Design a protein with these regions (language model features):
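Glycine/Thr-rich phosphate-binding loops of Rossmann-like dinucleotide-binding domains
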Residues: 7-8, 87
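Short gly/pro/ser/thr-enriched loop/turn and capping motifs at secondary-structure boundaries
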Residues: 28-33, 51-56, 80, 84-86
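Rossmann-fold NAD(P)-binding glycine/threonine-rich loop
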Residues: 9-16, 24-47, 58
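C-terminal catalytic/substrate-binding lobe primarily of soluble NAD(P)-dependent oxidoreductases
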Residues: 69-178
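Flexible, glycine/proline-enriched loop segments at strand-loop-helix junctions
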Residues: 46-51, 140-143
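Oxidoreductase and adenylate-handling cofactor-binding alpha/beta cores
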Residues: 57-73
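Rossmann-like NAD(P)-binding element
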Residues: 1-7, 22
Length: 178
C-alpha cells in the first residue's frame, strides 16, 4: 500500500496502462474528474475500501437499507468508526494500534475543514480545533471513547440517500483522553 499522496500518480499510470486500481483512501476531486476516462477504458477504480473509509460505508448502507426496507425513515445519521483496541493488547501510551499509515494518524488533526450538519445547522470545524470538540461515545462492553468529526460528512448525503436529513455526521473513535 502506498501513502495517499502518491495515489494520483499511480492512478494516472494505471489509466494509461489499462490497469484496475484499489485503494483504502478517500476519493479526491482530481480522481472523480477521471471517472469518464476510467469508465471509457473499461476499468474499475475502487476507493474507500479500508476501515474508514470503507467498512464503515458498507455497514452504514446495510443498516440504512434495512431501515428503508422495513418502512422506516432516517431522522438523523451519526456514525463513528475506529480501531478499538482489546484491553489485553493495549501496550502503548497512545492506547492505539496502527492499522493504517502511522504518519496519517499523527497528522489527523491537520489539513482542511471538517464539515457536517447537526440539527439543521451546518458546522465547519477547522482541523486545529478538531480535538477540542470531541464527544463521549459509549460502546457497550468496551467502555467510553472520544469521538471527533471526520473530514467532510456532507459529501456522503447523496451516496447514502439521506437528502435533507437535519443531522449527518461521520466520526472517528479514539480511546478516551487520547
Amino acid at each position: 500500500m502506498l501513502p495517499a499522496f502518491m495515489h494520483m500518480d499511480v492512478v494516472k499510470d494505471c489509466l494509461r496502462l489499462k490497469k484496475h486500481v484499489i485503494t483504502p483512501s478517500y476519493v479526491p476531486d482530481a480522481l472523480w474528474a477521471l471517472d469518464g476516462e476510467v469508465k471509457a477504458a473499461g476499468l474499475i477504480f475502487l476507493n474507500e475500501l479500508g476501515l474508514d473509509p470503507g467498512i464503515d460505508h458498507m455497514s452504514a448502507m446495510r443498516i440504512l437499507d434495512r431501515i428503508r426496507r422495513e418502512g422506516g425513515r432516517m431522522e438523523a445519521f451519526e456514525s463513528y468508526c475506529g480501531g478499538l483496541i482489546a484491553p489485553e493488547s493495549d501496550t502503548n501510551p497512545w492506547g492505539y494500534k496502527f492499522t493504517w499509515n502511522p504518519r496519517n494518524v499523527v497528522i489527523a488533526g491537520q489539513g482542511g475543514m471538517a464539515r457536517y450538519i447537526k440539527d439543521g445547522e451546518y458546522k465547519y470545524l477547522p482541523y486545529h480545533r478538531l480535538f477540542q470538540q470531541t464527544v463521549r461515545v459509549s460502546v457497550p462492553g468496551f467502555g467510553e471513547f472520544d469521538g471527533y468529526v471526520n473530514r467532510d460528512s456532507l459529501k456522503y448525503r447523496k451516496h447514502y440517500g439521506l437528502g435533507e436529513i437535519p443531522t449527518l455526521l461521520r466520526g472517528t473513535l479514539r480511546k478516551a483522553g487520547f
